[in-house]
Amino acid sequence: MEAKAVARYIRISPRKVRQVVDLIRGKKLNEALAILRYTPKRASAVVAKVVRSAAANAENNLQMDRDELFIKACYVDQGPTYKRYMPRAFGRADVMRKRTSHITVVVSDKKEG
Protein backbone atom coordinates (compact mmCIF):
# COMPACT_ATOMS: atom_id res chain seq x y z
CA MET A 1 0.00 0.00 0.00
CA GLU A 2 1.04 3.58 -0.41
CA ALA A 3 0.17 6.95 1.06
CA LYS A 4 0.92 10.40 -0.26
CA ALA A 5 1.09 14.02 0.78
CA VAL A 6 1.18 17.17 -1.35
CA ALA A 7 2.30 20.70 -0.53
CA ARG A 8 1.10 23.21 -3.09
CA TYR A 9 2.01 26.80 -3.94
CA ILE A 10 5.31 26.72 -2.04
CA ARG A 11 7.21 29.95 -2.73
CA ILE A 12 10.53 28.32 -3.69
CA SER A 13 11.73 27.75 -7.23
CA PRO A 14 11.08 24.16 -8.46
CA ARG A 15 14.69 23.87 -9.60
CA LYS A 16 15.93 24.49 -6.06
CA VAL A 17 13.43 22.08 -4.50
CA ARG A 18 14.37 19.33 -6.98
CA GLN A 19 17.98 19.45 -5.73
CA VAL A 20 16.73 18.47 -2.27
CA VAL A 21 14.11 15.95 -3.42
CA ASP A 22 16.69 14.05 -5.48
CA LEU A 23 18.64 13.29 -2.26
CA ILE A 24 15.85 11.26 -0.62
CA ARG A 25 14.20 9.37 -3.47
CA GLY A 26 14.12 5.61 -2.70
CA LYS A 27 15.47 5.94 0.86
CA LYS A 28 13.97 4.57 4.09
CA LEU A 29 11.81 7.08 5.97
CA ASN A 30 14.17 7.63 8.93
CA GLU A 31 17.19 7.90 6.64
CA ALA A 32 15.41 10.45 4.44
CA LEU A 33 14.47 12.60 7.45
CA ALA A 34 18.08 12.47 8.72
CA ILE A 35 19.38 13.59 5.32
CA LEU A 36 16.89 16.46 5.22
CA ARG A 37 17.74 17.53 8.77
CA TYR A 38 21.40 18.10 7.82
CA THR A 39 20.89 19.54 4.34
CA PRO A 40 21.61 23.30 4.45
CA LYS A 41 18.91 24.37 1.99
CA ARG A 42 15.70 26.31 2.64
CA ALA A 43 13.68 23.70 0.73
CA SER A 44 14.79 20.86 3.03
CA ALA A 45 12.50 22.04 5.85
CA VAL A 46 9.47 22.13 3.54
CA VAL A 47 10.26 18.72 2.01
CA ALA A 48 10.74 17.23 5.50
CA LYS A 49 7.31 18.53 6.50
CA VAL A 50 5.71 16.84 3.46
CA VAL A 51 7.57 13.57 4.19
CA ARG A 52 6.33 13.61 7.80
CA SER A 53 2.80 14.31 6.57
CA ALA A 54 2.92 11.36 4.16
CA ALA A 55 4.19 9.12 6.98
CA ALA A 56 1.36 10.29 9.26
CA ASN A 57 -1.17 9.60 6.50
CA ALA A 58 0.22 6.08 6.14
CA GLU A 59 0.10 5.44 9.90
CA ASN A 60 -3.29 6.92 10.71
CA ASN A 61 -5.33 6.29 7.56
CA LEU A 62 -3.88 2.98 6.36
CA GLN A 63 -2.47 1.48 9.62
CA MET A 64 0.98 0.99 8.08
CA ASP A 65 4.09 0.43 10.23
CA ARG A 66 6.26 3.57 10.33
CA ASP A 67 9.51 1.54 10.53
CA GLU A 68 8.74 -0.23 7.25
CA LEU A 69 8.09 2.92 5.19
CA PHE A 70 10.32 4.15 2.39
CA ILE A 71 10.07 6.99 -0.11
CA LYS A 72 8.52 5.34 -3.17
CA ALA A 73 8.23 8.51 -5.25
CA CYS A 74 8.80 12.20 -4.77
CA TYR A 75 8.58 14.87 -7.41
CA VAL A 76 8.23 18.60 -7.84
CA ASP A 77 5.92 20.29 -10.32
CA GLN A 78 5.91 23.95 -11.21
CA GLY A 79 3.09 26.05 -9.79
CA PRO A 80 1.88 29.45 -10.94
CA THR A 81 4.47 32.19 -11.37
CA TYR A 82 3.95 35.57 -9.75
CA LYS A 83 5.16 38.41 -11.94
CA ARG A 84 6.59 41.50 -10.26
CA TYR A 85 8.23 44.53 -11.83
CA MET A 86 11.64 45.92 -10.94
CA PRO A 87 12.46 49.49 -12.00
CA ARG A 88 15.60 49.86 -14.10
CA ALA A 89 17.53 52.77 -15.50
CA PHE A 90 16.10 55.20 -18.07
CA GLY A 91 12.47 54.53 -17.14
CA ARG A 92 12.48 50.86 -18.07
CA ALA A 93 11.22 47.93 -16.00
CA ASP A 94 12.13 44.25 -15.92
CA VAL A 95 9.79 41.41 -14.99
CA MET A 96 10.80 39.45 -11.89
CA ARG A 97 9.36 35.93 -11.88
CA LYS A 98 8.54 34.59 -8.42
CA ARG A 99 8.22 30.85 -9.03
CA THR A 100 6.17 28.43 -6.95
CA SER A 101 6.32 24.66 -6.50
CA HIS A 102 3.96 21.75 -5.88
CA ILE A 103 5.80 19.04 -3.88
CA THR A 104 4.45 15.45 -3.85
CA VAL A 105 5.80 12.61 -1.70
CA VAL A 106 4.57 9.00 -1.91
CA VAL A 107 5.56 6.49 0.78
CA SER A 108 5.08 2.73 0.66
CA ASP A 109 5.69 -0.17 3.03
CA LYS A 110 7.16 -2.71 0.65
CA LYS A 111 9.49 -2.68 -2.30
CA GLU A 112 8.02 -4.06 -5.49
CA GLY A 113 9.97 -6.41 -7.67
UniProtKB/Swiss-Prot annotation:
GO cellular component: cytosolic large ribosomal subunit
GO molecular function: rRNA binding; structural constituent of ribosome
InterPro entries per record: Ribosomal_uL22 (IPR001063), Ribosomal_uL22_bac/chlpt-type (IPR005727), Ribosomal_uL22_bac/org-type (IPR047867), Ribosomal_uL22_CS (IPR018260), Ribosomal_uL22_sf (IPR036394)
Keywords: Ribonucleoprotein, Ribosomal protein, RNA-binding, rRNA-binding
Record-linked Gene3D superfamilies: Ribosomal protein L22/L17
PROSITE patterns with a match to the protein in the record: RIBOSOMAL_L22 (PS00464)
Source organism, top-level taxon: Bacteria
Any one GO BP annotation for this protein: translation
Pfam families listed in its UniProt record: Ribosomal_L22 (PF00237)
Family, similarity comment: Belongs to the universal ribosomal protein uL22 family.
Subunit: Part of the 50S ribosomal subunit.
Function (record text): This protein binds specifically to 23S rRNA; its binding is stimulated by other ribosomal proteins, e.g. L4, L17, and L20. It is important during the early stages of 50S assembly. It makes multiple contacts with different domains of the 23S rRNA in the assembled 50S subunit and ribosome. The globular domain of the protein is located near the polypeptide exit tunnel on the outside of the subunit, while an extended beta-hairpin is found that lines the wall of the exit tunnel in the center of the 70S ribosome.
Protein known as: Large ribosomal subunit protein uL22
Organism: Pelotomaculum thermopropionicum (strain DSM 13744 / JCM 10971 / SI)
